[in-house]
């Protein structure tokens, strides 16, 4: 029997080091089989049996609170001066300044100044030293252990003031890091808070306010002007403009009428709407986005995996180097024990890997959160990194570069049948097809009649058309190529077809056993934004744009020239699109952009699969590496620029973290670096790295 898996939300998780220790403590619970801790989302997954009390005991060292995932947690705003850690930091500063005052007035340390410095160390560093000594007893060397050794070492050689300064600066930097990380986490918490927690439900002609968790499918909810929509559903009464920016990133409100779909978390701007609930609270689009974003933030990007491997060996190496500096010069070169012991302590402090360890995850978390708020769902750090390296983008045509709503433009009868009869015959077969062109024929036929001809033995011919039996005769609807496979076309028909295709229209033939009945032309309007977006892609480093389509060469070529695409590949079957993606890899990393439904194999084959219209289809959210929630390409250049910017920030962070350490280590040799300066270098690097990453929260990447 599989062990039970429970998911929890956390409060008070302040640093990556604390997260690692918390996870380690939980693993030591006998009844726990596996633990996954998502630091960016403050989320914990436990496989096995562990109570909330046991989990909170495992996180007691950092005051971590644990809540069931579905429980709504109300964040209490605690004033700065009321937080215990800030109170002890302020007390430590007062005692430190008093100690310096006494020391300065007496021309050096005396019992009173030492007592004040010691009090500053014990009050400001109580939590630090308690944790550090516990870790030291287990030979578990982390940041708190290194700092504790440094403070105790400073006291042992009589540098009480230095020890007190180290404690104070460490406390300040911890507070700044915690504040900055909370800011980064706001990208997720703001998503969670988008949808209302209650809704007005209509039952028996009366209005009741209920929690969204208690709503059922087919319940009818009322949304008044200015209110947020609480659940995904279908409009059954009223019409209004709805601002969908929270889900799709679109700034222009969308007019909703009877039968239209609406999403939880979007804003009803004008009229009153009655909406029939179509999804439970945990299945809404915003709930799925939150879940996928949290999973994405937990996934480690290649750069982060490298940094984690490096840090694993880095800390023990620093400990060994520190010990060697303390011992070798006095033993072999006649150096002073006190001087070299102090230098070893400084190396210990400088060597803390905090800034390095956090340099990548904080940038990834912030960038993915920013993208989600702008209507782009990036499903992992690896996809975020790879997007910035893309050199080739392949586009599906229908619904991606075009509007995806083709309309019948021409009907040509070449038999005794009328044009309406040709259309009706085609529609009677196409009503069983899922192809976008079939829907255009159906819409045209609906204007003529409500009843179609009865057909038998319908069969789809993949990528080419369909056939069925009508009144005892086998009738085909398909491409000119399918017709040519069965019978030659006359030169006059060939010219008619070519003329239509050169206008960017897709041609379908209707024929029976007696011969050709008619020709139907369909046109799908190119999106107004497609041309400008293609040009933007070239300016941000995309070298090649390719359209992959099952449409004919002439139509595809006309659209490709209109949009300025590098290359057009036409008359492709689904498996041929996959082969084409593979062949395009010779030019560099390839992204495939489609609707996430018909293009699933090609999306999976590309280095990065990008699906459009994620807000409207679960399939797009599931199949793609990146989902553009709006049904357009507007956010594609933004996504690529965000990826490139994130990579730059990560490299900057790593350079800052390592650069400051190298500089500090060089200053140790001549004895210019003091303990408090070492703390400033280490903690300053951490704060700079976090603040630098927070720049990714801006929309103008």
Per-region residue spans from a language model:
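Flexible metal-binding regulatory segments at protein termini and peripheral loops
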Residues: 1-111, 190, 205-207, 287, ...
């Amino acid at each position: 029997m599989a062990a039970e898996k429970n998911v929890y939300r956390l409060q008070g998780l302040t640093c990556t080091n604390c997260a690692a220790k918390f996870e380690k403590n939980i693993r030591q619970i006998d009844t726990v089989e596996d633990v996954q801790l998502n630091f960016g989302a403050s989320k914990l997954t436990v496989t096995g049996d562990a109570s909330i009390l046991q989990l909170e005991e495992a996180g007691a060292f950092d005051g971590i609170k644990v809540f069931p995932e579905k429980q709504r947690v109300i964040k209490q705003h605690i004033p700065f001066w009321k937080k215990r850690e800030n109170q002890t930091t302020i007390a430590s500063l007062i005692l430190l300044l008093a100690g310096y005052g006494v020391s300065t007035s007496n021309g050096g340390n005396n019992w009173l100044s030492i007592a004040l410095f010691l009090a500053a160390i014990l009050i400001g560093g109580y939590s630090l030293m308690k944790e550090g000594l516990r870790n030291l007893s287990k030979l578990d060397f982390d940041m708190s252990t290194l700092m504790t050794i440094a403070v105790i070492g400073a006291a042992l050689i009589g540098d009480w003031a230095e020890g007190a300064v180290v404690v104070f600066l460490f406390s300040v930097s911890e507070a700044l890091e915690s504040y900055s990380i909370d800011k980064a986490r706001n990208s997720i918490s703001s998503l969670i808070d988008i949808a209302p927690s209650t809704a007005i439900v209509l039952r028996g002609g009366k209005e009741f306010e209920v929690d969204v968790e208690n709503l059922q499918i087919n319940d009818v909810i009322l949304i008044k002007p200015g209110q947020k929509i609480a659940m995904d559903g279908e409009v059954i009464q009223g019409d209004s403009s709805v601002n969908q920016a929270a889900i799709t990133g679109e700034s222009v409100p969308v007019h909703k009428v009877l039968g239209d779909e609406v999403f939880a978390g979007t804003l009803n701007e004008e009229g009153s709407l009655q909406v029939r609930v179509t999804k439970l609270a945990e299945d809404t689009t915003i709930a799925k986005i939150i879940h996928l974003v949290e999973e994405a933030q937990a996934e480690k990007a290649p750069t982060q995996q490298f940094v984690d491997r490096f840090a694993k060996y880095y800390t023990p190496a620093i400990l060994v180097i520190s010990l060697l500096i303390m011992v070798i010069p006095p033993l072999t070169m006649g150096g002073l024990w006190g001087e070299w012991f102090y230098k070893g302590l400084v190396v210990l402090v400088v060597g803390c890997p905090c800034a390095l360890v956090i340099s990548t995850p904080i940038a990834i978390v912030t960038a993915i959160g920013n993208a989600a708020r702008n209507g782009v769902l990036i499903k992992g750090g690896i996809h975020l990194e790879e997007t910035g390296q893309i050199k080739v983008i392949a586009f599906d045509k229908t619904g991606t570069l075009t509007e995806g709503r083709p309309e019948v433009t021409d009907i040509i009868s070449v038999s005794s049948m009328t044009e309406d009869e040709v259309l009706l015959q085609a529609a009677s077969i196409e009503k069983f097809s899922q192809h976008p062109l079939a829907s255009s024929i159906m819409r045209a036929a609906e204007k003529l009649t409500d009843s179609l001809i009865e057909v038998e033995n319908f069969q789809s011919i993949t990528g080419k058309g369909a056939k069925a039996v009508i009144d005892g005769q086998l009738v085909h609807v398909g491409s000119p190529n399918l017709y040519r496979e069965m019978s030659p076309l006359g030169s006059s028909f060939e010219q008619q077809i070519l003329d239509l295709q050169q206008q960017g229209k897709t041609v379908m033939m209707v024929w029976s056993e007696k011969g050709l009945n008619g020709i139907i032309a369909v046109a799908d309007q190119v999106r107004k934004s497609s041309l400008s977006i293609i040009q933007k892609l070239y300016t941000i480093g995309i070298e090649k744009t390719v359209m992959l389509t099952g449409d004919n060469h002439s139509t595809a070529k006309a659209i490709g020239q209109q949009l300025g695409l590098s290359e057009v590949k036409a008359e492709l079957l689904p498996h041929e699109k996959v082969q084409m993606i593979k062949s395009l890899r010779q030019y560099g990393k390839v992204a495939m952009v489609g609707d996430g439904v018909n293009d699933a194999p090609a999306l999976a084959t590309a280095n990065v699969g990008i699906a459009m219209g994620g807000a409207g289809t679960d399939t797009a959210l599931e199949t793609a590496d990146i989902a553009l929630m709006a049904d357009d390409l507007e956010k594609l250049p933004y996504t690529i620029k965000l990826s490139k910017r994130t990579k730059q920030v990560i490299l900057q962070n790593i350079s800052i973290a390592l650069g400051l350490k190298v500089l500090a280590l060089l200053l140790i040799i001549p004895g210019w670096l003091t303990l408090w300066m070492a703390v400033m270098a280490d903690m300053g690097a951490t704060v700079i790295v976090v603040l630098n990453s927070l720049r990714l929260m801006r929309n103008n990447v």
